[in-house]
Regions:
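C-terminal substrate-binding subdomain of Rossmann-fold SDR/epimerase-dehydratase oxidoreductases
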Residues: 212, 216-333
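NAD(P)-dependent short-chain dehydrogenase/reductase
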Residues: 11, 129-138, 168-223, 229-234, ...
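NAD(P)H-binding glycine-rich loop region in Rossmannoid oxidoreductase-like domains
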Residues: 55-95
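Rossmann-fold cofactor-recognition segment
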Residues: 45-56
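Conserved internal alpha-helix in NAD(P)-dependent oxidoreductase domains
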Residues: 71, 90, 94-101, 109, ...
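Active-site Tyr-X1-5-Lys
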Residues: 142, 149-179
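N-terminal Rossmann NAD(P)H-binding glycine-rich loop of SDR-like oxidoreductase domains
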Residues: 5-25
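Conserved Rossmann-fold NAD(P)-dependent oxidoreductase catalytic core, especially the SDR/UDP-sugar
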Residues: 101-155
């Protein structure tokens, strides 16, 4: 009988690919999500167990985990924006931090030896010195940035850092393995529909597919690390299966700087008529602070065997193929 992995947020933009990767690795998967929407994984319906519930319900999470006795928990469930379009710090922290605490408690109750936590580049806050623009020296896991200005992004980052701290302390107290993966900016099919126009690379690709011009008034000089969702899933799968033990943080990205114009060029190779206009300067997402960086991925390479498989051209090609395969209509934005 195959080992089972318990995945929170398994119907999401990233989680759907994690479920797919784990199934391909031969695991059985229980996916726990607040929604039963499997539109990003129509090819997998019936191939995994779908559980619907609220990550804030610690008793429910613990009961489901205890019943299934998984070999590991992969925790992706999180809010990635304000659900009602207005600031709600309590909700953000209840879900993004309280949910992590519930998962760790469930691991102890269910005697689960390993938790893989999806963290983020936002854990670095505002990177400084040579790691910042214009040099973009790759950021190691040991780097401590400046606190980001108050915003959803700063709350998201705070919860990720605090979640990492919880995991390290649970590892020390109970001996479970805890691996936190800090992802670069993720490009994924379905992200535009689920997460909105802040999904700038999805905007570029889907507008290119539709022949709709995309214009950014600023940001042509900005660089950022971009990772494709299949590489995200690959890294998580490696963290689930590694023989490494203890508590660790790993950066996951391509480890190289890219600009919007680089992505536009890759899209134009696929769709020669695609038009993308990018003005000069920095901060194409207009977040107001240095949220852009390049990650040092050498530790993940050395300890997990991680190596990115999708450059920009492969990213665009697979993104388009996935939309077509899953019957997802591209959106103009």
């Amino acid at each position: 009988m195959s080992e089972r992995i318990f995945v929170t947020g398994g119907c999401g933009v990233n989680g759907s690919w994690v479920v797919r990767d784990l199934l391909e690795r031969g695991f059985e998967v229980s996916s726990f999500d607040h929604s039963s929407d499997t539109s990003l994984m129509p090819d997998l319906r019936g191939a995994f167990e779908l559980l619907v519930g609220d990550i804030r319900d610690g008793a429910l999470v613990s009961r489901l985990v205890h019943q299934r006795k998984p070999a590991a928990i992969v925790h992706l469930a999180a809010l990635v924006g304000y659900p009602q379009g207005r600031p709600d710090p309590k909700l953000v922290y209840d879900v993004n931090l309280g949910g992590t605490l519930n998962v760790l408690e469930a691991a102890i109750v269910g005697d689960v030896p390993r938790v893989v936590f999806t963290s983020s580049k936002s854990a670095y806050g505002v990177v400084t010195g040579a790691h910042a623009r214009p040099t973009y020296q790759p950021v190691p896991e040991t780097h401590v940035g400046l606190p980001a200005p108050a915003s959803f992004l700063s709350m998201y980052g705070h919860a990720k850092v605090a979640g990492e701290g919880l995991g390290f302390n649970y590892c020390a107290a109970f001996g479970i393995d805890f691996f936190a993966l800090r992802f670069a900016t993720i490009c994924a099919p379905g992200k535009l529909a689920r997460h909105g126009p802040m999904s700038v690379h999805s905007r570029l690709i889907e507008n290119g597919m539709l022949g709709v011009p995309t214009t950014f008034g600023q940001g042509g000089d900005e660089r950022d690390d971009i990772v494709y969702v299949r590489d995200v899933a690959q890294a998580i799968g490696r963290a689930v299966t590694t023989s490494h033990r203890g508590a660790e943080i790993y950066n996951v990205g391509q480890g190289r700087p890219f600009g919007l114009k680089d992505m536009a060029t890759a899209i134009q190779r696929r769709f020669p008529g695609a038009v993308c206009n990018v003005g000069p300067g920095y901060d194409f997402m207009k977040v107001g602070f240095g949220a852009y960086n390049v990650l040092d991925i050498s530790k993940a390479g050395a300890q997990l065997g991680y190596a990115p498989q999708y450059d920009l051209d492969a990213m665009v090609g697979d993104y388009v193929a996935a939309l077509e395969r899953f019957g997802i209509t591209p959106m103009a934005s």
